[in-house]
């Protein structure tokens, strides 16, 4: 499988290497839950390969995600602190995340969002990002999807061990093993990360260090019952403990900067796949249990919660002819949460179908419909249409792509419960489901030598957006109008001469809430500019990435300062199987703010070694 890194062309490099192939042949799964070559996909997708993930070397997955077009990340004070991953300017809780098919959303969270701050990069083999309203396959509330795949087994036995250390007394160790034969295969990973961190809050005069520990275990076991039937089990356990400032004792309400956040998520999935002739069937059941506890100077604080998510899914495909494929499925889910004061549970049923057709040999279209029945908010029907048209241009192809999608989001269990215990005006409000729609139009030019250029315009909006009352803190209110997000994504990947390659993206994002004001913490302009140099066969490689964010405002409407952050990565294959690697994050020691009141990491160097067998 060839590597694809989506990025924008700030400049089209001359001296393009004569080596490489068209990147339109890369196989993508996230768009329609079935493998499809990029050339046939009309939606906007990007991917990070195993090589790219390892070379960049970041400890947390959100650090990798922020290098991609259309993705903005805000972090509140270092590793393990709350981090929002926004796709195309939408709220972080509209971003859905899956690991080996497991939905890792937390029903006890404010709006049932994934806890990205506890999601580490160790053991991750591939990440695919689907941008825009994507409710068809993943639930009508999905405003973007991040599909994460861990390392898979191959014939025989293989593995790796890795250790790294660096600034803030940070250390990371991990191990991966995989093996199998024609009948049985397995893969397992274990990783431990520790850091003393830095002072997370700018107003904490004690200047204490807020550390974080994370232990992540992940395993998968597969059994080929017959040539057509496969059984697979996935299980994971994540435990995180972080220090932070500015918390309150739940009994005395005393303020403290000695605060602890304990997090644990246990999840598993069992799946059965059957393929025969023109039909395939996938039936799966997954369960996750997420628990969060907060302490102030050793005593209970606020924000505790436990959430459980059960999901039963069926996906089928029928290849009706050489040019026509049908995808259909069922999605049954139960959300439950308990915060110690109240507990709630809700069921939702979803049914969907999508037509995929190849017309005129170079026109690929999809048309899908989804029906959801929410226990509290009734039935909703949503749609998705997409198309990709290919034509030869020079020594390559141009793809004209377009997509349109709709969705809805029912108020979360937390939002409903908060309003029931709040006060006017929120307590007097009957929250309704949000509705969304969006479209994008784009051009892609992919040359046979590896040059990849993409330009996409997107426009999407949310009707009746739910938001927290920051004026009176009464609870959750509902906007009487549309919140909008539109803009342009530019992407470029170019092999250059003398071992150099260019990797860049730029996003312009114009957002407004239902009052016409810019939405908070969404930079109008984001860019990543990466340059990498590697020797023949990549015995040694070094890369530089510059990340910039401009024209953002805070929740008060106050402008946030623009910034640029420079990261450096290097990797040296000493002998077969042994790599020494290092990186410097924030090379220029930029003093920048993502969320007012919270500090960001200064210049930090890390060194490590990896042995593969």
Regions found by a protein language model. Give the residues of each.
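N-terminal periplasmic accessory domains that precede
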Residues: 61-64, 83-86, 95-98, 114-119, ...
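Outer-membrane beta-barrel signature, preferentially recognizing the C-terminal barrel domain
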Residues: 250-275, 305-308, 344, 399, ...
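Gram-negative outer-membrane beta-barrel transporters
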Residues: 327, 358-365, 453, 458-461, ...
